[in-house]
């Protein structure tokens, strides 16, 4: 028996020959399997959530809490949206310390959006709910992800809400009341002006792995039981 000693380089895969292929963008082939074929259970759950008479405004999806998976779910939801592109929201008019709200008449209005699906794997309070800023006496209102998802769907990782339970409590309140109220993030520093609340309606998909789902179900047993459930 002949024993041949190999150098470590002989054991390294030859990737140089395939660099040109790796550099090419991935093109979806018309023969690629559809999402409904590969994930029929998840597809059905999304159809239930998007139904006008859905049993719940919340959906729990067991999947890795990574942006790639959240975006895949978002893409699937977009294909099912029958009202995509519908103008919703409003416009805040700020005059000194007086703020008024009117209905949106254009997508350029500061709190208007076209119904869509918004996904986020990690957010802070200002990113999710927007904020009020004051500089040299001038007041500006900044919309958050909930305003972008108004009339549509917000997809968010459970770990974000489990790590920041106050975010979850406020998000749940917004969904249940279908209204957004402006509140200070720090109770010791109240808002300098009164801001009218605005109608806000959205559905939420909470994405988490087994441990996150178990923790959430322990925290929200009733909502977890009522929510639409599926797995990726």
Regions found by a protein language model. Give the residues of each.
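Conserved ASCE/P-loop NTPase catalytic core
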Residues: 1-218, 222, 228-232
């Amino acid at each position: 028996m002949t024993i041949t000693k190999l150098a470590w380089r002989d054991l390294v895969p030859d990737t140089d020959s395939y660099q040109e292929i790796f550099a090419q963008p991935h093109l979806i082939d018309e023969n690629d399997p559809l999402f409904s074929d590969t994930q029929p259970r998840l597809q059905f759950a999304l159809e239930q959530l998007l139904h006008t008479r859905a049993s719940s405004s919340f959906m729990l999806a067991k999947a890795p809490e990574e942006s790639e998976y959240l975006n895949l779910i978002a893409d699937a939801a977009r294909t099912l949206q029958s009202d995509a592109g519908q103008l919703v929201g409003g416009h805040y008019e700020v005059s000194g310390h007086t703020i008024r709200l009117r209905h949106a008449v254009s997508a350029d209005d500061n709190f208007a959006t076209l119904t869509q699906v918004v996904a986020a794997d990690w957010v802070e309070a200002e990113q999710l709910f927007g904020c009020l800023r004051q500089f040299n006496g001038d007041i500006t209102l900044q919309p958050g992800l909930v305003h972008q998802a108004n009339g549509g769907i917000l997809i968010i990782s459970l770990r974000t809400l489990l790590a920041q339970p106050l975010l979850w409590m406020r998000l749940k309140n917004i969904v249940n009341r279908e209204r957004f109220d402006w509140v200070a993030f720090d109770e010791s520093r109240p808002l300098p002006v009164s801001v009218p609340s605005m109608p806000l309606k959205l559905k939420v998909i909470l994405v988490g792995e087994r441990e996150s789902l178990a923790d959430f179900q322990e925290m929200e047993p009733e909502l977890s039981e009522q929510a639409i459930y599926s797995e990726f």
